[in-house]
Amino acid sequence: YDFSNLRPHVDFFNAMTYDIHGGWSSHAGHNSPLYQSPPGDADGSIETGINYLANTRGLPEEKINMGIPFWGKKYNTSSINGSFTGSVIDMHYSEILPLVGNGWTYQWDNTAKCPYLIKDDQSKIITYDNPLSIQHKCEYAQNRNLGGVMVWALGYDDMASEESLTGAINLYWLNIEKSKKSILPEEIELNTYPNPFNPKMKINFYLPYKTEVNLSLYDMRGRL
């Protein structure tokens, strides 16, 4: 792409910072490592991808959105960076989550800042993202002043239960943004009293960014 011509006309660029490793790779590896693992890995990482877009292609970092995958990859291998055989299978997070502790052992790669699972018989591994790795990714994006984060795909989350990956982005990205940009008071109190001529009350307010709002209603005796 001719980024120099695109820059003035595009609000943001979604960087697909996943599929770093796969069936085309010379070894197994994380789907979306924040940093190269092993160090210097030629397949790269999120950081090397963002560096390329910013430093080599000249994209303003504030226009780059980091991609976060809600899926992982299953390899026929016994180690995270080992050689593998056969096909590499994509798996949704909703399919991976029930496996943790059920025939699969959880591992954390502190270099890549990513989790993975090893099958108890040492025959397979699954690389994926979880709320902890998403926390590291959101904090990295914030520290580099990136434009934001984007995901592929919302429907791959554990939709039947907690939607924990979506919740992690809400917690670690939106709360970071709130602390950075907040111009609203943390609390505001409104007093209203019964009116037989107007028994209904409507409260309108505008929020300049996404955030959670908690409303507490008390009666005349101060009871919640």
What role is predicted for each listed range?
Residues L174-K178:
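Short, compositionally biased serine/threonine- and acidic-rich segments at solvent-exposed termini, linkers
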Residues Y1-L99:
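Substrate-binding surface in catalytic domains of secreted glycosidases
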Residues K180-L224:
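C-terminal outer-membrane/trafficking sorting elements
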Residues W24, H30, K63-Y140, G167-W173:
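Glycan-binding loop/region signatures in secreted carbohydrate-active enzymes
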Residues F3, I46-N51, C138, E163-N170:
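Generic structural signal for well-ordered alpha-helices
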Residues G155-A160:
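Acidic-and-aromatic substrate-binding clefts and catalytic sites of carbohydrate-active enzymes
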Residues Y140-G147:
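Conserved, well-ordered alpha-helix/loop/beta-strand core segments that scaffold catalytic motifs
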